[in-house]
Amino acid sequence: MAREREGGGRGRREDREERDSEFVDKLVHINRVAKVVKGGRRFGFAALVVVGDQKGRVGFGHGKAREVPEAIRKATEAAKRGLIRVSLREGRTLHHDVNGRHGAGKVILRAAPQGTGIIAGGPMRAVFETLGMQDVVAKSLGSSNPYNLVRATFEALKNEDSPRSVAARRGIKVSTLQSRRRDADPADQSEAAVA
């Protein structure tokens, strides 16, 4: 027996809308560009969009078109094609501090205690909000170009490792790794007190 759907068809549009509804998108930057032609200037728009599911997946895209909505649509589609998965500690922050760099844009991302919130500027804030991160401290150095900052933030997020992946790479158990970390912490604190 064939399943009946309201509206007929095979339901591809409905499936696509359900898949799209799980993503949150944020417009980071829109830029008006001009091409000089024989008859004058021809204007176009470039859009930078960040898309995420607020559960650890995020992507960014760049789109160009003659009209703003079309540029945003293209950027959103590109962002959905380039999603990356980021492991979050307790579903709210990073496992460890990471640095990222793209061009002259540099970012430092630090794990933060619960209740800190997102302490980040401009383009980085959009990435963290769509990622679903709740507590993070971020600092951007060098270039303030939104394209470079978003790319540098993604480079930093790609460098982040969960304890599970580190333990698998070293061939040890996660509990062993975490016990070593707890054993090392008091020594670091006593050395800091002496200095």
UniProtKB/Swiss-Prot annotation:
Keyword Hydrolase part of the UniProt annotation? no
Keyword terms: Ribonucleoprotein, Ribosomal protein, RNA-binding, rRNA-binding
Provide the residue span(s) of the region labelled Disordered. 1-20, 161-195
- UniProt-listed PROSITE patterns: RIBOSOMAL_S5 (PS00585), S5_DSRBD (PS50881)
InterPro entries the UniProt entry points to: Ribosomal_Su5_D2-typ_SF, Ribosomal_uS5, Ribosomal_uS5_bac-type, Ribosomal_uS5_C, Ribosomal_uS5_N, Ribosomal_uS5_N_CS, Ribsml_uS5_D2-typ_fold_subgr
Q: Which GO terms describe its cellular component?
A: small ribosomal subunit
Annotated S5 DRBM domain residues:
23-86
Q: Which GO terms describe its biological process?
A: translation
Highest taxon listed in the record's lineage: Bacteria
Pfam family name, one: Ribosomal_S5
**What terms describe the molecular function in GO for this protein?**
rRNA binding; structural constituent of ribosome
Q: What does this protein do?
A: With S4 and S12 plays an important role in translational accuracy. Located at the back of the 30S subunit body where it stabilizes the conformation of the head with respect to the body.
Homology family: Belongs to the universal ribosomal protein uS5 family.
- Subunit comment: Part of the 30S ribosomal subunit. Contacts proteins S4 and S8.
Q: What is known of its domains?
A: The N-terminal domain interacts with the head of the 30S subunit; the C-terminal domain interacts with the body and contacts protein S4. The interaction surface between S4 and S5 is involved in control of translational fidelity.
UniProt name for this protein: Small ribosomal subunit protein uS5
Which species does the entry assign this protein to? Methylobacterium radiotolerans (strain ATCC 27329 / DSM 1819 / JCM 2831 / NBRC 15690 / NCIMB 10815 / 0-1)
